[in-house]
Amino acid sequence: MATKKTIITKDQIVSMYMNYVLEHSEKPKSVYHFTKINDFTETEFYAFFGTIESIEKEIFKMFVDKTIDLLNKNKEYELYDMKGKMLSFYFTFFEILTANRSYVVLVLKEHDNQLKKLMQLSGLRNSFRDYLSEIITDDFRTQQEKLQNFQEKAFLEASWIQLLLTLKFWL
């Protein structure tokens, strides 16, 4: 009788990846190597991820998604103002990071190149920006419009003063 193989999920792959990185202090050399030591196929891997780097991006995105899911489970969260929602987000997000601190510190301190860190956090950035778009209120937009009007007036006056100073220098 043949044994029935269980279907692997995206979350399981992410968990195996995080464990691998923590145990070896480096990312796997290849998809083949990673799938072989974790006893699943490359086809199963490629059903969710295109590269090893895409898992890294997905992990931080998943931290944001988990944060938002936890916040939305709280019935009172919908009643919070924008500031309250942001504070709740930060608190919950950093609690999730704390729960995964060893992994987060290892992968973010791995790169001296800031650009590589930014690339790794691109999924987090996109999810965070989407979250912000959802919680921005009309009051905030009105305040921003007032601020933009003020900035425009300040720019016009500063430019006028700059022209006067340049004229004075020219004389």
Show where each model-derived region lies.
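Short linear capping/connector segments at secondary-structure termini
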Residues: 107-113, 145-148
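Hydrophobic alpha-helical connector segments
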Residues: 58, 73-106, 113, 123, ...
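An amphipathic alpha-helix adjacent to DNA-recognition modules
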Residues: 10-18, 46-72, 76, 83, ...
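Amphipathic, well-packed alpha-helical segments that form the structural scaffold of globular domains
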Residues: 68, 72, 98, 108, ...
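Acidic/His metal-coordination segments adjacent to aromatic residues that form catalytic metal sites
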Residues: 79, 141-148
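Solvent-exposed, amphipathic alpha-helical segments
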Residues: 16-23, 66-70, 162-170
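Short, amphipathic alpha-helix enriched in basic
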Residues: 2, 8-43, 47, 56-61
